[in-house]
């Protein structure tokens, strides 16, 4: 990371509540939300922040949603939050957790008001429309939990690893033209600010010259000691594969384990995509 970016993200660390002790609000407080601009990290990996050559969404699942009904009785639910990858900002995850905690003792007349309030606040925070769905537990009791992504699992490859900082030079192709769906459960990086581990699974769908599987797995494992937010890691993987492997089409989909009741699931693609039907829940989630 260059010096300018270090200063930007140090300011984020100082101004946000990541890595700091926090007080919890007794009542609704949208001021707890903290945006983080996408542009600086995209410039670092040569992704034009204003480009329309890639598409995607960030989807968050929140498993600890609660408020009070008009009689003061607690309601519990789950929320699905999604927004386009071209929003100017992402939401800092701890600030989202603190915001949702501020709803715990707040009275709402109905779930529609809860949804409208959350959508309005998050859209204002990131400068782009945010879709919010809130589900009572009865509606998601039958939700399927998948053991793994579809595709060929790279993790069965018997490779030797010694590089744990991002190394795109591991990426290479042969002349054979293929369409493949690959995945790994070995993705691990660290939070850019707190250095806490982020655990995830990643699926790679592409068409083009065949990517060397061993090299791709080594590349994914090389994120192990890398410090970046979830969304930035998935965009870096997308950008590196596009640069070093030059596929005709590419989709990179990350699903991370939860922290503070939240999991983050970014998807980036060369193709226009919608998130409907994509929000599968993996076994570690």
UniProtKB/Swiss-Prot annotation:
Residue ranges that the Swiss-Prot or TrEMBL entry lists as coiled coil: none
Keyword Cytoplasm applies: yes
InterPro entries: GTP-CH-I_C/QueF, NADPH_dep_7-cyano-7-deazaG_red, QueF, QueF_N, QueF_type2
Chief localisation class: cytoplasm
Enzyme Commission code(s) on record: 1.7.1.13
Annotated catalysed reactions: 7-aminomethyl-7-carbaguanine + 2 NADP(+) = 7-cyano-7-deazaguanine + 2 NADPH + 3 H(+)
Keyword set, alphabetical order: Cytoplasm, NADP, Oxidoreductase, Queuosine biosynthesis
GO cellular component: cytoplasm
Sites where the protein binds substrate: 91-93, 230-231
Subcellular location: Cytoplasm
A GO biological-process term: tRNA modification
Biochemical pathway: tRNA modification; tRNA-queuosine biosynthesis
List of residues binding NADPH: 93-94, 259-260
Family per record: Belongs to the GTP cyclohydrolase I family. QueF type 2 subfamily.
Functional note: Catalyzes the NADPH-dependent reduction of 7-cyano-7-deazaguanine (preQ0) to 7-aminomethyl-7-deazaguanine (preQ1).
HAMAP family linked to this entry: QueF_type2
Protein name per the record: NADPH-dependent 7-cyano-7-deazaguanine reductase
Organism the protein comes from: Legionella pneumophila (strain Lens)
């Amino acid at each position: 990371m260059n010096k300018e970016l270090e200063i930007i993200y140090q300011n984020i660390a100082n101004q946000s509540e990541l890595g700091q002790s926090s007080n919890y609000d007794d009542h609704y407080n949208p001021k707890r939300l903290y945006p983080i601009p996408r542009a600086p990290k995209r410039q670092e990996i040569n992704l034009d922040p204003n480009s329309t050559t890639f598409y995607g969404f960030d989807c968050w699942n929140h498993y600890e949603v609660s408020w009070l009904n008009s009689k003061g009785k607690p309601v519990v639910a789950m929320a699905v939050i999604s927004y386009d990858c071209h929003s100017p900002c992402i939401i800092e995850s701890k600030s989202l957790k603190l915001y949702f905690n501020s709803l715990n003792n707040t009275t709402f007349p109905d779930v529609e008001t809860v949804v409208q309030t959350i959508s309005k606040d998050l859209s204002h925070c990131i400068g782009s429309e945010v879709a919010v769905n809130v589900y009572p537990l009865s509606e998601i009791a039958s939700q399927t939990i998948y053991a793994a992504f579809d595709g060929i699992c790279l993790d069965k490859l018997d490779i030797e690893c010694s590089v744990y900082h991002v190394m795109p030079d591991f990426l290479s192709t042969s002349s054979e033209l293929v369409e493949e769906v690959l995945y790994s459960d070995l993705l691990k990086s660290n939070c850019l600010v707190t250095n806490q581990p982020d655990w995830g699974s990643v699926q790679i769908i592409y068409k083009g010259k065949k990517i060397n599987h061993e090299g791709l797995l080594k590349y994914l494992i090389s994120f192990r000691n890398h410090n970046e937010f979830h969304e930035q890691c998935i965009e870096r993987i997308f950008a590196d594969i596009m640069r070093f492997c030059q596929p005709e089409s590419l989709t990179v989909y990350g699903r991370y384990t939860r922290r503070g009741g939240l999991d983050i699931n970014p998807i980036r693609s060369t193709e226009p995509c919608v998130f409907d039907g994509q929000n599968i829940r993996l076994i570690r989630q």
